[in-house]
Amino acid sequence: MSDQDARWKPDAESWSILEVINHLADEEEADFIVRLDYTLNRRTDPWPPIDPQGWVTERRYNERSLGESLQRFLSSRQQSWRWLRGLENPDWDIVYEAPWGPIRAGDVFAAWVAHDLLHMRQIIEVHWAFLNQNVTPYSTRYAGEW
């Protein structure tokens, strides 16, 4: 997929594939791993603030390179895996008192995985819309129901 294609959006309210990938990279570095670390190791410290929605425009995700963005995400994910593998008998039931209420370390970890899956679905949906817009005069019907 070219950078230009990765910038395509089905509508003004949707994110492009490039925006989703950069969001995942920022979340990998500033959200889940940080908040899981705080929950496991620094429960009395407040979680650092994040602004995932604002970062999309503030950090100009859609102006970035797809290749560099993917590499950044993959590199951050590798660091996260190394950190996770280094945990010794984490207590997944430890509770952090978030502003909205208690959350366990296991909840943060489960949400991290779920967040990935939600955005994988989002990328697939955007790619599907892009394909269907760009195959005209042909059709994807033969592939099956969406």
Describe the role of every protein-language-model region:
Residues R7-P52, V95-W146:
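Short, contiguous alpha-helical
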Residues Q53-D93, D107-W112:
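Acidic/histidine-rich alpha-helical segments that form the ligand environment
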